[in-house]
Amino acid sequence: MKFLQIIKHLKLQNKKNALDNFVNCRTYEHISNINKLFLNNFSSTKEHSEHGQVKHENFLNSTLKYEENSQNGSTNNLKNGKYNMYVSEGNVNINEEKYKDNNISSNNTQYNNNSSNSGSLNDEGPLWKEHIDDVVNENKKKKMNRFYLDSQATTMIDPRVLDKMLPYMTYIYGNAHSRNHFFGWESEKAVEDARTNLLNLINGKNNKEIIFTSGATESNNLALIGICTYYNKLNKQKNHIITSQIEHKCILQTCRFLQTKGFEVTYLKPDTNGLVKLDDIKNSIKDNTIMASFIFVNNEIGVIQDIENIGNLCKEKNILFHTDASQAAGKVPIDVQKMNIDLMSMSGHKLYGPKGIGALYIKRKKPNIRLNALIHGGGQERGLRSGTLPTHLIVGFGEAAKVCSLEMNRDEKKVRYFFNYVKDYLTKHLDYIVFNGCQINRYYGNMNISFLFVEGESLLMSLNEIALSSGSACTSSTLEPSYVLRSIGISEDIAHTSIRIGFNRFTTFFEVQQLCINLVKSVERLRSISPLYEMELEKKNPSNDDIPKFIWT
């Protein structure tokens, strides 16, 4: 699709606004997503904010009331374990009307623009109905439009973030550590402004508390290895770490590396909801314990740990507390002061920022937390992470944090709304499904569902136009069942039937509807050829007395 056609279709008034919309297309060949994405999120006027960002459009109604449809409904238990089994016979009635109003307004006025020219999901005008470039197969036959629902793996960059980054990728190119001229000062100021934005997001107190890294993996390695090696050098008796069995791979592999260096690691098993019990943590703390590390929001099942009480316990026992907040920062409220968090890892591309940038929060307190560096060189980042700072990535990370701090509440309402809609729809149309993880203490942008008698990989293949996953993006290339699901007591057979759905800021109601419709169709089709499902139905309905019974000898 040519650039001028995009301008004509969106009825934009200038090329600046057109570019802002064009750069955020998921792929150039799938321009049809502009309808479902931009016409719901961006205005088509000439107005821009102070730095030239496109002002954000209202696209959900904050007056909507959401049902806390957590663990209610018709519930059965499997013979092999305790799971929430939602069956179609349950009293689940979907009020379709409450899902039609998808016009949520935001309390944030900085990015709002109440333009009457913008489209909406229920818009009857030609802008909404007309598709520019539907995805076609090799035979030039129309297929379902592709869309993205794997937001725990990564998120698309917000156009406002990209708009903020562009000057630092072109004409503002100074090294932030070149303090002898204006070019360096300009970049240094941009970096410090980004630190401030991150601090505001998590309620930090000092710019020196933020150390920029290449991502959450490096931040986690720096936190665990840096802390353990430093304090072990001061006191050889200090060599114990506490974590859980459902951490991200980068935490688990780092702990295994430390075990090869003589450190002792306790891996706590969560309960069936995916929550680590405080009593288990308390009983695991020993005199030689250095630190505890627990993930804030689990990347596979979306469960939120009781971070505040864990932080208070660690403070009481005088041990350091680290949390991997790569899935939490910008999505759920974080207060590092109230939660007594000593170290926290964050990632840019998980909160609508660029890839290749992350941060480690290190609380400045008395005595200050000290740790050894992993990368040595010019002494940047207080000597903890040497190397020239990628100014454009840091600026994008900071702007993404700023946008999240302003729009977090609206984003949370939106994904909770989609979560409840999908849950209601599936429980009405399908039986033998399991919603994995706690359904109350969770981030609602993450859904992990097991469809019994359907192989998860087969389901993903049948939905190949919808970007979903069967678990963590770091391990989904293997056919092994999710270690997170196995750790919360789910059998291997059921773990193989699970898929993960990830909603985000740019997910539209149209996409959620298409997901539900195609999920039900695919599950029913795959179950129709499943002998295990047929056997299960025969067990439930043993009324075929007229059928002759054969005895094999």
Curated annotation (Swiss-Prot):
Single GO BP term: iron-sulfur cluster assembly
Cofactor(s) listed: pyridoxal 5'-phosphate
One annotated Gene Ontology cellular component of this protein: mitochondrion
Region (Disordered): 102-125
SUPFAM superfamilies xrefs: PLP-dependent transferases
Enzyme class: transferase
The protein's role, per its UniProt record: Catalyzes sulfur activation and mobilization in iron-sulfur cluster formation (ISC) pathway for iron-sulfur (Fe-S) cluster biogenesis. Active when in complex with a partner protein Isd11.
Organism of origin: Plasmodium falciparum (isolate 3D7)
Compartment(s): Mitochondrion
Ranges of biased composition (kind: Low complexity): 102-122
Subunit comment: Homotetramer. Interacts with Isd11; the interaction enhances cysteine desulfurase activity of IscS. Interacts with IscU. Component of a complex, at least composed of IscS, Isd11 and IscU.
Known EC number: 2.8.1.7
Family: Belongs to the class-V pyridoxal-phosphate-dependent aminotransferase family. NifS/IscS subfamily.
Biological or metabolic pathway of the protein: Cofactor biosynthesis; iron-sulfur cluster biosynthesis
UniProt GO molecular function: cystathionine gamma-lyase activity; cysteine desulfurase activity; iron-sulfur cluster binding; metal ion binding
Name recorded for this polypeptide: Cysteine desulfurase IscS
Pfam family, one: Aminotran_5
InterPro entries registered for this protein in UniProt: Aminotrans_V_dom, Aminotrans_V_PyrdxlP_BS, PyrdxlP-dep_Trfase, PyrdxlP-dep_Trfase_major, PyrdxlP-dep_Trfase_small
